[in-house]
């Protein structure tokens, strides 16, 4: 039963892969399929620098589900020439190319070559630069022919400030202008992305037949109804049922979930995760969520912004069985859903830490030389070695279980009031909640931290990352763009600046290299508390100007000299700044009647092998989706 349920849900997850490619950019499916046709069908020399560079480019496109970086959102620069690629495309069997009806190979090249090779065409998937039209300058495929002002006006007209249970406007549609009229093209069966959603529904239907509990059966039925109707009220009903389904050992996310890929933060990318509960590790998160009211009451936030009664925060540690869509191959380590503020305050939220993913990261990080290069002295190294794995997991738990679930909006405040800054402010709020409490004696009392000093490992690595080492993920000359990175720099730079007079945190030089030194850990905690109070105020009151000022002052700009130094030191370590995961492969064993008797799991599939299999077996959408 369990195995069949996991198998059906993983199939439902894999069927959605093409949706995300198309959401990330309208040429992504065409370009991916051209590259795959050349990669598999090219008869020329595959050892030339051009072919090798094309292979790297294709592997990056697979990794980012498109031609823009999955994190920084800048467009990839191909290391191969247009001449090589044109000749290669013309040399393969035309039947393997994504040609539109009546289109020649030459016309196909003409259509997409500027998108691949011209750095000025669609340079950024999500543009967050203040003062620009964020919709027109972003390459993501959530809007077509509309300006930022038109998009904002369209959705503001739909909103009713008096509605206390608003739907997530715009969540599941592309906003387009056709014949001068602005309208939504909804992602649903029979609508946009219908071919993929039909397949997802087919496998969900099978999963419904072997659901573990009546609650889970109801969740799956409601999700199918949402996919079939595209009705956002139905989506809210599904989210409420999902939050309340706490007894199933197997759980899943499948749908349009996070809005980081939309410059206006409304439209959601498609993702899926199938998982089962890690019963032993979940005791840790249940201890935290069981004390949620204590944490809320004692937080350093103004009382008017606190929840009087914390509702249904459920927390668990899970083992991921499959990653898909926007969670594959690079994934989150923790998830807290649903995102609708009113559902969270009325019905609670589900928070998960993905145990097998954090475990893999921890194992990969030990002994790779990174800390030895960037940590100031042996004293900090010993702290990190002793406690960082524990405090890091705890910080994730606190961020997901309590941070996102804490605080409240004042009545009448639009949840989208912070616009483009909303994601960064929300991530900073959750991180600060975790940072403030990871140092609390309450955690030692609950047996969650092994000693009163353990939190120092988290404070040191967090500030080192926010002030310095996360810059390894950014190209020279670029700003910080991604919401999670912006939030970390915002917190670290703000604490550094506000504590400067007392030298709470310093950047010092030793042997010509820059290091972070924390001189007063308790004052750092006080500063985290002060910033948490301010960020909660901004969120609760919908203070757009306050969000703008904080983010633009601390989170965006990079010190070019420090950046160059960090990149130089990192380069010598020969490490990759991002990590992704290959999924296990599930196969069914059937009896003579075709009934499933077992599901086998194998882990021997390579990265390119898996990506090509997915492109073959789960190609659910045409190359152009209008």
Language model region names:
Residues 213, 391-408, 430, 435:
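Active-site recognition of the HExxH zinc-binding catalytic motif
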Residues 519-626:
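Extended, compositionally biased alpha-helical segments that mediate assembly or anchoring
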Residues 1-5:
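Conserved small/polar residues in nucleotide/adenosyl-binding loops
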Residues 407-428:
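Post-HEXXH active-site segment of zinc metalloproteases
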Residues 18-23, 214-221, 235, 413-416, ...:
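Short, glycine/acidic-rich hinge or "gate" loops at secondary-structure transitions
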Residues 281-304, 308-316, 494-567:
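C-terminal interaction module
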Residues 435-538:
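Long, well-structured alpha-helical subdomains associated
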Residues 50-382, 388:
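Contiguous, non-catalytic segments that form substrate-binding/exosite surfaces or channel walls
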